[in-house]
C-alpha cells in the first residue's frame, strides 16, 4: 500500500483548514458500464471463463485497484454511505410490510394469543396453504424476527405510524446515498482527515453513540415508556384513566405529540411533570418514577422494565459523552492514543518485548484491514453476547414467550457473530501480508508474537487434542455402556456424576444477590437484580414460561467441553492463518504471493491449505460446526428444561418433558431424541401451513450436498473433462471464443464453502421453525 506524497512546493496546511479535495473524481457512469474497469487486465474482456471469477474476487479489493491509501480510504468511506442506504431501504421494507400486510394491531390487542404475521402469500398455484390462521381472524405466514415486540417497545401503536416510518426510512436512504456520491465525487476527504484518530474517537463516542443514546433516551422517556405503561395497564386488565377518559385499547392512547403535554403525561409519570429544574438543583430523585433501577423483568410482559431500559441508555449516554472528551484533538489537551500505546511495555516474564507496543499505533492507523479485524472480532463477540441476553434478559415485551422468535434470534446472533470473527481473521491475515513492515516492527509486541508463533500454535494444538480426546471419550464411553446395558457405569446425573460445580456456584452467587442493596444508589433491596435463569423463580406470562431457572448437570458439562473443543479448534485454524500469513517452513515467500494464491500451478505441488485465505476457508467449516452444536444444545435444553406451560398448581409442563439430561449424554441420544424426533414436524409438514419449511428442508439439503461436489473432487478431473469436451467441439468447428476452464482450487473451495454454509443454514432454519411453529 502506498501513500501519496504532497505535491512539490505545496505547503502543508492544517487539516482543519482544508479537510477535503473539491471535485476529486467526476461521476463517469459510462465507465461503470465496462466490466472490470478497475483493472487493466480485466478491462480487456474475457478470454477464458476464469475472467468472471477474477471479476468477482477483485471488484471490492480496493487495495489492488490503485494501491493508494488515500484513494482506497475514500472509496471505503463512500461505500459506507451506500451500505447505510441499503440498510434504510431494508428497514423501510420491514416498516412497509408491517403497515400494509401485517396483523400488528391485532397482535397488539392480544399478544399472548395472536401470533405475529407480516406476510401474506399470493394464491398462484396453491401456495396460499402457507397462510395459516395466526389468530383474530388473520391468515398469513407467522414471522419470528421479533419486530412486533420491538415496535411495541418503541411505542408504536398503529399501522399509520409504521407507514410514516417506512416513508422516513426511504427519505434517509436517499440522503445517505447522496452523501456517498458527494463525499467521493464532490468533496473527498484527505488521508490526513481519515488518520485523525482522536477526532474520530470523539465523533464516534460523543456524536454517534453518546448523543445517539441520549436521543434514544429522550424518545423512550417521552413517547415509548408512557405508551408502554398504558399498554401494560390494558394487558393487566386495569386500564389507566387520562383526563377522565379510560384508555381501554391501543386506539385510545394519545398520539406521540400529545404526550409532550406535561399535564397529560404527568398522570402516567408524575416525574415528567415536575420540570427540568430538578435536574439543575440535583433533585434527581424526582425522576425516579421514569428512570428506575427495578431489576428483573416486568411480570405483565416478561421483558425488562422499559423505565430500566431508559435509565440504561441515559447512563451510557453520559459515560460516552464524558469519555469522548478525554482525547487530544484541536486544543492540545487530553490523551494521545499514540502516547498511550507507545508507553505500554510487554510483560517482562511471559512475553518480553523491549519495545512494548511501539509502532502499534502507526500500524493500526495505516492499515484499515488491521482496524477492521479488531472491530469485527469485538462486534462478533458482542453479537454472541447479545444472543445470550435475548433469552436471559428479554428486552422487548412478550418476546420471552414467543419461543420460535427467541430461538430464531439466538441462532441469528450466534451465526452473525461467528461469521464476523472469521472475517476478523481474514482481514488480520490481509493486514499482516499487505500492511506489516518487518523492518519497522522490531522487538515490539507484534514482532515477539510472530517469533513465538510456534509455541502459541503448538500449545493451542495440545489444548485441542486434550479437549477433543477427553470430551469425545466421555461420549464414546456412555454410548458403549448404554449399548451394553450398564447404565450404572455411565456418566450421568443418576450414576457417575460430573456436575458443573463452578457454573452452579456462579449461579448461586448471582441468585443470592436478589434482595440485596448491591447496586449503588439503592436503599431498598432489589426485587430481581439479576436474570431469573440464575436460580430464580418461574415468570409466567399468559400461562407460558417466560423465564425460569436453568438447571445444569452432567449433560451440560459434557456438552460444554465439546463446545470448548470446537471453539479452540476454530481459534487454532484462524490464528495459525494470521501468524503464518507471511511465511512458513513449506512456503517461506508467502508474503510475496499474497492473501490467496493458487496451489495448482508449476512448482506449487503440496501447497494447498497454506495461504492465509485457506485458513479462513477451513475456519468457516469449524465455525459452522461449533455453532451448530451451540444452537442445537440451546434448542433442546430450552425445550426440555425451560419452555412450557405453567399449570394451575404452579408446576411446569415442558415441551419435551425433560428428556435432555438422560438423552444428551450419548451420541445416539442426540441422533434419536433430538435430530430424528424433533424433525417430525418438518418431515410431516406437507399439506399444512408449514409446507414451505418442508420444501426448504429438502432444498437446503440439496444445496449442502451440492457443495460437496466442489469440496471432494480435484481440479484435474474437471479440467480433463472440459478439455475432452472442447476437443470434440474443435473437431466440429464449434469451439467457443471464451475458453472454458475449470475453477482453480481456491475458486472451487470458495463455491464449496458458500454452498455448504448456505445449505446448512437453510436446513437448520427450516428444522427449527417447523419444530417450534408446529408445536404451537
UniProtKB/Swiss-Prot annotation:
Bilayer topology annotation: Multi-pass membrane protein
Binding positions for divinylchlorophyll a' per the UniProt entry: 701
Subunit structure, as described in the record: The PsaA/B heterodimer binds the P700 divinyl chlorophyll special pair and subsequent electron acceptors. PSI consists of a core antenna complex that captures photons, and an electron transfer chain that converts photonic excitation into a charge separation. The cyanobacterial PSI reaction center is composed of one copy each of PsaA,B,C,D,E,F,I,J,K,L,M and X, and forms trimeric complexes.
Matching NCBIfam families: psaA (TIGR01335)
EC identifiers of the protein: 1.97.1.12
GO terms of molecular function: 4 iron, 4 sulfur cluster binding; chlorophyll binding; electron transfer activity; magnesium ion binding; oxidoreductase activity
Keywords on record: 4Fe-4S, Chlorophyll, Chromophore, Electron transport, Iron, Iron-sulfur, Magnesium, Membrane, Metal-binding, Oxidoreductase, Photosynthesis, Photosystem I, Thylakoid, Transmembrane, Transmembrane helix, Transport
Keyword Ubl conjugation: no
Role played: PsaA and PsaB bind P700, the primary electron donor of photosystem I (PSI), as well as the electron acceptors A0, A1 and FX. PSI is a plastocyanin/cytochrome c6-ferredoxin oxidoreductase, converting photonic excitation into a charge separation, which transfers an electron from the donor P700 chlorophyll pair to the spectroscopically characterized acceptors A0, A1, FX, FA and FB in turn. Oxidized P700 is reduced on the lumenal side of the thylakoid membrane by plastocyanin or cytochrome c6.
Residues the record lists as binding [4Fe-4S] cluster: 599, 608
Co-factor note (free text): PSI electron transfer chain: 5 divinyl chlorophyll a, 1 divinyl chlorophyll a', 2 phylloquinones and 3 4Fe-4S clusters. PSI core antenna: 90 divinyl chlorophyll a, 22 carotenoids, 3 phospholipids and 1 galactolipid. P700 is a divinyl chlorophyll a/divinyl chlorophyll a' dimer, A0 is one or more divinyl chlorophyll a, A1 is one or both phylloquinones and FX is a shared 4Fe-4S iron-sulfur center.
Family statement: Belongs to the PsaA/PsaB family.
Signal peptide region: none
Catalysed conversion reaction: reduced [plastocyanin] + hnu + oxidized [2Fe-2S]-[ferredoxin] = oxidized [plastocyanin] + reduced [2Fe-2S]-[ferredoxin]
Subcellular location: Cellular thylakoid membrane
UniProt GO BP: photosynthesis
Originating species: Prochlorococcus marinus (strain MIT 9303)
Main location, first listed in the record: membrane
UniProt name for this protein: Photosystem I P700 chlorophyll a apoprotein A1
Gene3D superfamilies linked to this entry: Photosystem I PsaA/PsaB (1.20.1130.10)
Keyword Hydrolase among record annotations: no
Amino acid at each position: 500500500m502506498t501513500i501519496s506524497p504532497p505535491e512539490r512546493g505545496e505547503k502543508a496546511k492544517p487539516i482543519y483548514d482544508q479537510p477535503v479535495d473539491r471535485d476529486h473524481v467526476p461521476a463517469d457512469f459510462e465507465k461503470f458500464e465496462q466490466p472490470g474497469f478497475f483493472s487493466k487486465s480485466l478491462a480487456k474482456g474475457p478470454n477464458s471463463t476464469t475472467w468472471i471469477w477474477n471479476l468477482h474476487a477483485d471488484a471490492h479489493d480496493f487495495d489492488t485497484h490503485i494501491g493508494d491509501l488515500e484513494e482506497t480510504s475514500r472509496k471505503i468511506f463512500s461505500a459506507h454511505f451506500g451500505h447505510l442506504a441499503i440498510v434504510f431501504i431494508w428497514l423501510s421494507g420491514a416498516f412497509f410490510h408491517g403497515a400494509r400486510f401485517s396483523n400488528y394491531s391485532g397482535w397488539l390487542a392480544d399478544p399472548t394469543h395472536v401470533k405475529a404475521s407480516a406476510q401474506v402469500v399470493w394464491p398462484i398455484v396453491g401456495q396460499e396453504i402457507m397462510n395459516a390462521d395466526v389468530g383474530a381472524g388473520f391468515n398469513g405466514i407467522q414471522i419470528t424476527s421479533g419486530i412486533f415486540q420491538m415496535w411495541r417497545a418503541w411505542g408504536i401503536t398503529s399501522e399509520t405510524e409504521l407507514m410514516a416510518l417506512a416513508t422516513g426510512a426511504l427519505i434517509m436512504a436517499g440522503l445517505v446515498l447522496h452523501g456517498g456520491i458527494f463525499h467521493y465525487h464532490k468533496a473527498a476527504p484527505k488521508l490526513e482527515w481519515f488518520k485523525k484518530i482522536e477526532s474520530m474517537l470523539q465523533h464516534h463516542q460523543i456524536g454517534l453513540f453518546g448523543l445517539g443514546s441520549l436521543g434514544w433516551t429522550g424518545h423512550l422517556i417521552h413517547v415509548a415508556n408512557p405508551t408502554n405503561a398504558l399498554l401494560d395497564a390494558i394487558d393487566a386488565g386495569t386500564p389507566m384513566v387520562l383526563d377522565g377518559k379510560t384508555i381501554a385499547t391501543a386506539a385510545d392512547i394519545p398520539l406521540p405529540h400529545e404526550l409532550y403535554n406535561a399535564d397529560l403525561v404527568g398522570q402516567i409519570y408524575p416525574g415528567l411533570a415536575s420540570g427540568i429544574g430538578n435536574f439543575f438543583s440535583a433533585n434527581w430523585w424526582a425522576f425516579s418514577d421514569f428512570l428506575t433501577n427495578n431489576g428483573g423483568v416486568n411480570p405483565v410482559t416478561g421483558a425488562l422494565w422499559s423505565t430500566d431500559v431508559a435509565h440504561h441508555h441515559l447512563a451510557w449516554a453520559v459515560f460516552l459523552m464524558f469519555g469522548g472528551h478525554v482525547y487530544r484533538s484541536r486544543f492540545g489537551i487530553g490523551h494521545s492514543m499514540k502516547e498511550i500505546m507507545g508507553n505500554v511495555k510487554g510483560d517482562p516474564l511471559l512475553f518480553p518485548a523491549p519495545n512494548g507496543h511501539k509502532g502499534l499505533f502507526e500500524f493500526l492507523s495505516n492499515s484499515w484491514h488491521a482496524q477492521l479485524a479488531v472491530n469485527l472480532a469485538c462486534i462478533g463477540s458482542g453479537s454472541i453476547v447479545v444472543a445470550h441476553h435475548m433469552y436471559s434478559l428479554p428486552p422487548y415485551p412478550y418476546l420471552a414467550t414467543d419461543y420460535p422468535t427467541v430461538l430464531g434470534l439466538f441462532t441469528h446472533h450466534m451465526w452473525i457473530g461467528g461469521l464476523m470473527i472469521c472475517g476478523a481473521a481474514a482481514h488480520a491475515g490481509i493486514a499482516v501480508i499487505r500492511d506489516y513492515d518487518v523492518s519497522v516492527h522490531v522487538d515490539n509486541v507484534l514482532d515477539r508474537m510472530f517469533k513465538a508463533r510456534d509455541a502459541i500454535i503448538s500449545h493451542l494444538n495440545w489444548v485441542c487434542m486434550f479437549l477433543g480426546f477427553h470430551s469425545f471419550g466421555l461420549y464414546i464411553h456412555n454410548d458403549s455402556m448404554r449399548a451394553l446395558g450398564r447404565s450404572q457405569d455411565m456418566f450421568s446425573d443418576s450414576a457417575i456424576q460430573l456436575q458443573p460445580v463452578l457454573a452452579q456456584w456462579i449461579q448461586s452467587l448471582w441468585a443470592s444477590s436478589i434482595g440485596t442493596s448491591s447496586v449503588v444508589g439503592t436503599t431498598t433491596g432489589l426485587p430481581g437484580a439479576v436474570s431469573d435463569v440464575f436460580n430464580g423463580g418461574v415468570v409466567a406470562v399468559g400461562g407460558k414460561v417466560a423465564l425460569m431457572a436453568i438447571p445444569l448437570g452432567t449433560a451440560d458439562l459434557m456438552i460444554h467441553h465439546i463446545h470448548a473443543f470446537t471453539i479452540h479448534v476454530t481459534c487454532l485454524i484462524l490464528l495459525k492463518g494470521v501468524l503464518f500469513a507471511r511465511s512458513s517452513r513449506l512456503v517461506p515467500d508467502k508474503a510475496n504471493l499474497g492473501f490467496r494464491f493458487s496451489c495448482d500451478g508449476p512448482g506449487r505441488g503440496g501447497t494447498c491449505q497454506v495461504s492465509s485465505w485457506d485458513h479462513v476457508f477451513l475456519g468457516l467449516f469449524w465455525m459452522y460446526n461449533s455453532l451448530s452444536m451451540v444452537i442445537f444444545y440451546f434448542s433442546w435444553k430450552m425445550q426440555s428444561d425451560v419452555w412450557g406451560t405453567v399449570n394451575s398448581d404452579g408446576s411446569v409442563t415442558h415441551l419435551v418433558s425433560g428428556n435432555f439430561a438422560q438423552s444428551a449424554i450419548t451420541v445416539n441420544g442426540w441422533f434419536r431424541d433430538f435430530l430424528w424426533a424433533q424433525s417430525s414436524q418438518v418431515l410431516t409438514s406437507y399439506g399444512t401451513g408449514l409446507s414451505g419449511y418442508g420444501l426448504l428442508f429438502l432444498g437446503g439439503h440439496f444445496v449442502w450436498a451440492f457443495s460437496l461436489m466442489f469440496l471432494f473432487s480435484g481440479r484435474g478431473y474437471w479440467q480433463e473433462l472440459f478439455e475432452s469436451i472442447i476437443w470434440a467441439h474443435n473437431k466440429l468447428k464449434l469451439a467457443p471464443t471464451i475458453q472454458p476452464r475449470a475453477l482453480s482450487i481456491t475458486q472451487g473451495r470458495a463455491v464449496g464453502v458458500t454452498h455448504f454454509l448456505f445449505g446448512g443454514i437453510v436446513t437448520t432454519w427450516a428444522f427449527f421453525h417447523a419444530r417450534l411453529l408446529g408445536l404451537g
